Protein backbone atom coordinates (compact mmCIF):
# COMPACT_ATOMS: atom_id res chain seq x y z
CA UNK A 1 0.00 0.00 0.00
CA UNK A 2 2.90 2.39 0.72
CA UNK A 3 3.88 2.61 -2.96
CA UNK A 4 0.33 3.59 -3.92
CA UNK A 5 0.16 6.15 -1.13
CA UNK A 6 3.43 7.71 -2.32
CA UNK A 7 2.07 8.06 -5.87
CA UNK A 8 -1.06 9.74 -4.58
CA UNK A 9 0.95 12.12 -2.37
CA UNK A 10 2.82 13.15 -5.54
CA UNK A 11 -0.50 13.75 -7.30
CA UNK A 12 0.03 10.92 -9.77
CA UNK A 13 -2.78 8.77 -11.15
CA UNK A 14 -2.84 5.03 -10.49
CA UNK A 15 -3.21 2.65 -13.41
CA UNK A 16 -6.26 0.42 -13.59
CA UNK A 17 -4.19 -2.56 -12.44
CA UNK A 18 -2.63 -0.60 -9.57
CA UNK A 19 -6.07 0.50 -8.41
CA UNK A 20 -7.36 -3.06 -8.65
CA UNK A 21 -4.53 -4.28 -6.43
CA UNK A 22 -4.97 -1.34 -4.07
CA UNK A 23 -8.68 -2.17 -3.89
CA UNK A 24 -7.92 -5.73 -2.83
CA UNK A 25 -5.61 -4.35 -0.14
CA UNK A 26 -8.34 -2.00 1.10
CA UNK A 27 -10.55 -5.05 1.63
CA UNK A 28 -7.81 -6.96 3.45
CA UNK A 29 -8.52 -7.18 7.19
CA UNK A 30 -4.81 -6.87 7.97
CA UNK A 31 -4.42 -3.38 6.53
CA UNK A 32 -4.39 -0.50 9.03
CA UNK A 33 -7.46 1.73 9.22
CA UNK A 34 -5.15 4.74 9.05
CA UNK A 35 -3.83 3.49 5.70
CA UNK A 36 -7.37 3.09 4.35
CA UNK A 37 -8.31 6.60 5.49
CA UNK A 38 -5.15 8.12 4.02
CA UNK A 39 -5.68 6.35 0.70
CA UNK A 40 -9.29 7.53 0.36
CA UNK A 41 -8.51 11.14 1.28
CA UNK A 42 -5.46 11.38 -0.99
CA UNK A 43 -7.35 9.85 -3.91
CA UNK A 44 -10.19 12.31 -3.40
CA UNK A 45 -7.79 15.26 -3.23
CA UNK A 46 -6.12 14.20 -6.48
CA UNK A 47 -9.37 13.47 -8.31
CA UNK A 48 -10.50 10.05 -9.53
CA UNK A 49 -9.98 8.86 -13.11
CA UNK A 50 -12.09 6.38 -15.06
CA UNK A 51 -9.23 3.86 -14.86
CA UNK A 52 -9.05 4.18 -11.07
CA UNK A 53 -12.81 3.84 -10.69
CA UNK A 54 -12.87 0.75 -12.89
CA UNK A 55 -9.92 -0.81 -11.07
CA UNK A 56 -11.67 -0.46 -7.71
CA UNK A 57 -14.97 -1.70 -9.15
CA UNK A 58 -13.17 -4.83 -10.41
CA UNK A 59 -11.86 -5.53 -6.91
CA UNK A 60 -15.23 -4.98 -5.23
CA UNK A 61 -17.13 -7.12 -7.71
CA UNK A 62 -14.56 -9.88 -7.30
CA UNK A 63 -15.12 -9.90 -3.52
CA UNK A 64 -18.93 -9.59 -3.72
CA UNK A 65 -21.26 -12.54 -3.15
CA UNK A 66 -21.16 -14.82 -6.21
CA UNK A 67 -24.07 -14.89 -8.65
CA UNK A 68 -24.81 -17.48 -11.30
CA UNK A 69 -25.43 -14.62 -13.74
CA UNK A 70 -27.60 -16.80 -15.97
CA UNK A 71 -30.29 -14.11 -16.04
CA UNK A 72 -30.20 -12.29 -19.37
CA UNK A 73 -31.18 -8.68 -20.03
CA UNK A 74 -31.08 -7.32 -16.46
CA UNK A 75 -30.94 -3.58 -15.80
CA UNK A 76 -30.25 -1.36 -12.78
CA UNK A 77 -31.35 2.25 -12.32
CA UNK A 78 -29.54 2.89 -9.03
CA UNK A 79 -28.03 6.36 -8.57
CA UNK A 80 -25.11 7.54 -6.48
CA UNK A 81 -27.12 9.56 -3.97
CA UNK A 82 -25.20 12.31 -2.24
CA UNK A 83 -26.92 15.28 -3.87
CA UNK A 84 -28.36 16.46 -0.55
CA UNK A 85 -31.66 17.42 -2.20
CA UNK A 86 -33.83 15.23 0.06
CA UNK A 87 -36.10 14.18 -2.83
CA UNK A 88 -38.53 11.28 -2.63
CA UNK A 89 -37.30 7.86 -3.80
CA UNK A 90 -37.36 8.56 -7.52
CA UNK A 91 -35.25 5.67 -8.82
CA UNK A 92 -36.88 3.06 -6.58
CA UNK A 93 -40.37 4.14 -7.64
CA UNK A 94 -39.19 4.19 -11.26
CA UNK A 95 -37.85 0.65 -10.90
CA UNK A 96 -41.40 -0.72 -10.63
CA UNK A 97 -42.41 1.30 -13.69
CA UNK A 98 -39.55 -0.32 -15.61
CA UNK A 99 -40.55 -3.77 -14.38
CA UNK A 100 -44.16 -3.10 -15.37
CA UNK A 101 -42.90 -2.28 -18.86
CA UNK A 102 -41.18 -5.65 -19.13
CA UNK A 103 -37.63 -4.82 -18.02
CA UNK A 104 -35.85 -7.15 -15.59
CA UNK A 105 -34.69 -4.82 -12.82
CA UNK A 106 -31.86 -5.78 -10.45
CA UNK A 107 -32.16 -2.80 -8.09
CA UNK A 108 -28.97 -2.26 -6.12
CA UNK A 109 -29.43 -0.03 -3.07
CA UNK A 110 -28.84 0.80 0.56
CA UNK A 111 -30.29 2.52 3.58
CA UNK A 112 -30.29 6.30 3.84
CA UNK A 113 -26.90 7.98 3.89
CA UNK A 114 -27.42 11.64 2.96
CA UNK A 115 -31.23 11.48 2.67
CA UNK A 116 -33.95 10.62 5.18
CA UNK A 117 -35.06 7.49 3.34
CA UNK A 118 -32.90 5.14 1.29
CA UNK A 119 -34.23 2.56 -1.15
CA UNK A 120 -33.93 -0.19 1.47
CA UNK A 121 -35.88 1.89 4.00
CA UNK A 122 -38.65 2.58 1.48
CA UNK A 123 -38.99 -1.03 0.35
CA UNK A 124 -39.14 -2.30 3.93
CA UNK A 125 -41.88 0.23 4.67
CA UNK A 126 -43.79 -1.03 1.64
CA UNK A 127 -43.50 -4.61 2.90
CA UNK A 128 -40.69 -5.95 0.73
CA UNK A 129 -38.25 -8.37 2.35
CA UNK A 130 -34.84 -6.94 1.41
CA UNK A 131 -32.85 -9.87 2.82
CA UNK A 132 -32.52 -12.06 -0.27
CA UNK A 133 -29.72 -14.46 -1.12
CA UNK A 134 -28.18 -14.54 -4.62
CA UNK A 135 -30.24 -17.62 -5.53
CA UNK A 136 -33.42 -15.93 -4.30
CA UNK A 137 -32.55 -12.81 -6.28
CA UNK A 138 -32.10 -14.93 -9.41
CA UNK A 139 -35.53 -16.45 -8.77
CA UNK A 140 -37.17 -13.06 -8.28
CA UNK A 141 -35.61 -11.67 -11.45
CA UNK A 142 -36.77 -14.65 -13.48
CA UNK A 143 -40.29 -15.02 -12.07
CA UNK A 144 -41.20 -11.54 -10.78
CA UNK A 145 -39.08 -9.35 -13.04
CA UNK A 146 -37.63 -7.24 -10.25
CA UNK A 147 -35.38 -7.90 -7.25
CA UNK A 148 -33.63 -5.78 -4.63
CA UNK A 149 -29.95 -6.24 -3.86
CA UNK A 150 -29.15 -4.83 -0.41
CA UNK A 151 -25.63 -3.49 -0.96
CA UNK A 152 -24.14 -4.26 2.51
CA UNK A 153 -25.31 -7.87 2.20
CA UNK A 154 -23.90 -8.18 -1.32
CA UNK A 155 -20.53 -6.71 -0.30
CA UNK A 156 -19.68 -8.04 3.19
CA UNK A 157 -16.00 -7.15 2.73
CA UNK A 158 -16.94 -3.45 2.83
CA UNK A 159 -18.10 -3.44 6.46
CA UNK A 160 -14.90 -1.94 7.85
CA UNK A 161 -14.58 0.61 5.05
CA UNK A 162 -18.15 1.78 5.70
CA UNK A 163 -17.15 2.52 9.30
CA UNK A 164 -14.08 4.49 8.20
CA UNK A 165 -16.10 6.45 5.62
CA UNK A 166 -18.55 7.53 8.32
CA UNK A 167 -15.69 8.63 10.56
CA UNK A 168 -14.07 10.63 7.74
CA UNK A 169 -17.38 12.33 6.93
CA UNK A 170 -16.11 13.55 3.54
CA UNK A 171 -17.05 12.30 0.06
CA UNK A 172 -14.77 9.60 -1.31
CA UNK A 173 -14.60 7.40 -4.40
CA UNK A 174 -17.13 5.11 -2.70
CA UNK A 175 -19.78 7.80 -3.12
CA UNK A 176 -19.48 7.31 -6.87
CA UNK A 177 -19.12 3.59 -7.34
CA UNK A 178 -22.24 2.19 -5.65
CA UNK A 179 -24.19 1.81 -8.91
CA UNK A 180 -21.13 0.31 -10.61
CA UNK A 181 -20.67 -2.57 -8.16
CA UNK A 182 -23.95 -4.41 -8.76
CA UNK A 183 -22.87 -8.09 -8.74
CA UNK A 184 -25.52 -9.10 -11.29
CA UNK A 185 -24.28 -9.26 -14.88
CA UNK A 186 -26.24 -6.26 -16.18
CA UNK A 187 -26.77 -5.60 -19.88
CA UNK A 188 -28.03 -2.02 -19.56
CA UNK A 189 -27.97 0.69 -16.93
CA UNK A 190 -29.38 4.11 -16.02
CA UNK A 191 -27.19 5.96 -13.53
CA UNK A 192 -27.86 9.29 -11.84
CA UNK A 193 -24.78 11.00 -10.39
CA UNK A 194 -24.43 14.14 -8.27
CA UNK A 195 -21.13 15.29 -9.83
CA UNK A 196 -21.40 16.67 -13.35
CA UNK A 197 -17.67 16.38 -14.04
CA UNK A 198 -17.88 12.61 -13.50
CA UNK A 199 -20.48 11.97 -16.22
CA UNK A 200 -17.95 10.94 -18.84
CA UNK A 201 -15.69 8.89 -16.52
CA UNK A 202 -18.68 6.92 -15.21
CA UNK A 203 -19.90 6.28 -18.77
CA UNK A 204 -16.41 5.05 -19.67
CA UNK A 205 -16.48 2.65 -16.72
CA UNK A 206 -19.89 1.33 -17.83
CA UNK A 207 -18.37 0.76 -21.26
CA UNK A 208 -15.49 -1.19 -19.70
CA UNK A 209 -18.03 -3.23 -17.71
CA UNK A 210 -19.55 -4.37 -20.99
CA UNK A 211 -22.89 -2.59 -20.86
CA UNK A 212 -24.67 -2.82 -24.21
CA UNK A 213 -26.43 0.48 -23.57
CA UNK A 214 -26.41 2.98 -20.72
CA UNK A 215 -27.34 6.53 -19.84
CA UNK A 216 -25.67 8.63 -17.13
CA UNK A 217 -27.46 11.78 -15.96
CA UNK A 218 -26.71 14.75 -13.76
CA UNK A 219 -29.94 16.60 -13.21
CA UNK A 220 -30.60 20.32 -13.05
CA UNK A 221 -29.49 21.59 -9.65
CA UNK A 222 -26.89 18.78 -9.53
CA UNK A 223 -29.53 16.17 -8.74
CA UNK A 224 -28.55 12.50 -9.06
CA UNK A 225 -31.77 12.03 -11.06
CA UNK A 226 -33.25 13.66 -14.14
CA UNK A 227 -34.96 16.84 -12.97
CA UNK A 228 -37.97 18.84 -14.16
CA UNK A 229 -36.28 22.02 -12.89
CA UNK A 230 -34.29 22.67 -16.06
CA UNK A 231 -31.55 21.36 -18.31
CA UNK A 232 -30.23 17.88 -17.54
CA UNK A 233 -26.75 16.84 -18.64
CA UNK A 234 -26.49 13.27 -19.91
CA UNK A 235 -23.99 10.92 -21.48
CA UNK A 236 -25.34 8.07 -23.60
CA UNK A 237 -23.48 4.83 -24.29
CA UNK A 238 -24.84 3.02 -27.35
CA UNK A 239 -23.21 0.81 -29.98
CA UNK A 240 -19.96 1.18 -28.02
CA UNK A 241 -19.98 4.93 -28.66
CA UNK A 242 -20.32 7.67 -26.04
CA UNK A 243 -22.32 10.81 -26.81
CA UNK A 244 -22.87 13.85 -24.57
CA UNK A 245 -26.09 15.85 -24.75
CA UNK A 246 -28.55 17.86 -22.69
CA UNK A 247 -32.24 17.20 -22.07
CA UNK A 248 -34.85 19.88 -21.44
CA UNK A 249 -37.99 18.44 -19.80
CA UNK A 250 -40.17 21.04 -21.53
CA UNK A 251 -39.29 19.44 -24.87
CA UNK A 252 -41.12 16.33 -23.69
CA UNK A 253 -44.24 18.11 -22.52
CA UNK A 254 -43.38 18.60 -18.84
CA UNK A 255 -43.79 21.83 -16.93
CA UNK A 256 -40.75 23.07 -15.07
CA UNK A 257 -40.81 22.19 -11.38
CA UNK A 258 -38.27 23.26 -8.77
CA UNK A 259 -36.43 20.44 -7.02
CA UNK A 260 -37.78 21.69 -3.69
CA UNK A 261 -41.27 20.65 -4.84
CA UNK A 262 -40.33 16.97 -5.04
CA UNK A 263 -38.80 16.66 -1.60
CA UNK A 264 -39.64 13.52 0.32
CA UNK A 265 -39.69 12.75 4.01
CA UNK A 266 -39.42 9.72 6.25
CA UNK A 267 -40.09 6.19 5.04
CA UNK A 268 -43.84 6.39 5.71
CA UNK A 269 -44.17 9.65 3.79
CA UNK A 270 -42.12 8.38 0.87
CA UNK A 271 -44.04 5.10 0.76
CA UNK A 272 -47.25 7.12 0.45
CA UNK A 273 -45.78 9.05 -2.49
CA UNK A 274 -44.63 5.86 -4.21
CA UNK A 275 -48.04 4.23 -3.84
CA UNK A 276 -49.79 7.35 -5.13
CA UNK A 277 -47.54 7.45 -8.20
CA UNK A 278 -47.92 3.74 -8.94
CA UNK A 279 -51.69 4.04 -8.46
CA UNK A 280 -51.87 6.61 -11.26
CA UNK A 281 -52.35 9.81 -9.28
CA UNK A 282 -51.35 12.89 -11.28
CA UNK A 283 -48.68 15.00 -9.59
CA UNK A 284 -45.19 16.47 -9.93
CA UNK A 285 -43.96 13.23 -8.39
CA UNK A 286 -45.53 11.25 -11.24
CA UNK A 287 -44.03 13.56 -13.87
CA UNK A 288 -40.58 13.20 -12.31
CA UNK A 289 -40.92 9.41 -12.38
CA UNK A 290 -42.16 9.49 -15.98
CA UNK A 291 -39.10 11.46 -17.08
CA UNK A 292 -36.65 9.19 -15.26
CA UNK A 293 -38.36 5.93 -16.19
CA UNK A 294 -38.72 7.14 -19.77
CA UNK A 295 -35.00 7.85 -19.99
CA UNK A 296 -34.26 4.46 -18.42
CA UNK A 297 -36.50 2.63 -20.92
CA UNK A 298 -34.66 4.41 -23.71
CA UNK A 299 -31.32 3.48 -22.12
CA UNK A 300 -32.50 -0.13 -21.91
CA UNK A 301 -33.35 -0.21 -25.60
CA UNK A 302 -36.98 -0.96 -24.83
CA UNK A 303 -37.87 2.09 -26.90
CA UNK A 304 -36.11 3.80 -29.79
CA UNK A 305 -36.69 7.32 -28.50
CA UNK A 306 -37.03 9.12 -25.18
CA UNK A 307 -40.55 10.22 -26.16
CA UNK A 308 -41.58 6.59 -26.62
CA UNK A 309 -39.96 5.74 -23.30
CA UNK A 310 -42.04 8.33 -21.48
CA UNK A 311 -45.23 7.05 -23.14
CA UNK A 312 -44.37 3.45 -22.20
CA UNK A 313 -43.67 4.54 -18.61
CA UNK A 314 -47.10 6.18 -18.44
CA UNK A 315 -48.73 3.03 -19.80
CA UNK A 316 -46.90 0.89 -17.22
CA UNK A 317 -48.46 3.00 -14.47
CA UNK A 318 -51.92 3.59 -15.92
CA UNK A 319 -52.41 -0.05 -16.90
CA UNK A 320 -51.73 -1.11 -13.29
CA UNK A 321 -48.69 -3.16 -14.30
CA UNK A 322 -46.20 -1.13 -12.25
CA UNK A 323 -48.24 -1.45 -9.05
CA UNK A 324 -48.79 -5.14 -9.76
CA UNK A 325 -45.00 -5.64 -9.84
CA UNK A 326 -44.68 -4.05 -6.40
CA UNK A 327 -47.42 -6.25 -4.97
CA UNK A 328 -45.90 -9.35 -6.55
CA UNK A 329 -42.45 -8.52 -5.14
CA UNK A 330 -43.92 -8.03 -1.66
CA UNK A 331 -45.47 -11.50 -1.76
CA UNK A 332 -42.60 -13.31 -3.46
CA UNK A 333 -39.82 -11.76 -1.36
CA UNK A 334 -41.55 -12.85 1.84
CA UNK A 335 -42.11 -16.43 0.75
CA UNK A 336 -39.75 -19.18 1.83
CA UNK A 337 -38.19 -19.90 -1.54
CA UNK A 338 -37.30 -23.49 -0.69
CA UNK A 339 -37.01 -24.38 -4.35
CA UNK A 340 -33.85 -22.30 -4.67
CA UNK A 341 -32.26 -22.96 -1.27
Swiss-Prot record:
Binding site for Mg(2+) 2: 224-225
Cofactor dependency: Mg(2+)
Residues noted as binding anthranilate 2 in the record, renumbered to the chain: 165
Cofactor note: Binds 2 magnesium ions per monomer.
GO terms (BP aspect): L-tryptophan biosynthetic process
Catalytically driven reaction(s): N-(5-phospho-beta-D-ribosyl)anthranilate + diphosphate = 5-phospho-alpha-D-ribose 1-diphosphate + anthranilate
Keyword Amino-acid biosynthesis in record: yes
InterPro entries tied to this protein: Anthranilate_Pribosyl_Tfrase, Glycosyl_Trfase_fam3, Glycosyl_Trfase_fam3_N_dom, Glycosyl_Trfase_fam3_N_dom_sf, Nuc_phospho_transferase
Protein family membership: Belongs to the anthranilate phosphoribosyltransferase family.
Subunit structure: Homodimer.
Protein name as catalogued: Anthranilate phosphoribosyltransferase
Amino acid sequence: MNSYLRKLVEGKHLTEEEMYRAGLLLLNENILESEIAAFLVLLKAKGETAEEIYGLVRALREKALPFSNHIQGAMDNCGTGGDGAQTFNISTTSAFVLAGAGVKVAKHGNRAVSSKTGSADLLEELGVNISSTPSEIDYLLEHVGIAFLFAPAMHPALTRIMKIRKELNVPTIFNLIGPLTNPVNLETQFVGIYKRDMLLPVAQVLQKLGRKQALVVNGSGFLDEASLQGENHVVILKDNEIVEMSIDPEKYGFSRVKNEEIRGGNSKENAKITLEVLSGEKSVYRDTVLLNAGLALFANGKTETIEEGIKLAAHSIDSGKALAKLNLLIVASNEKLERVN
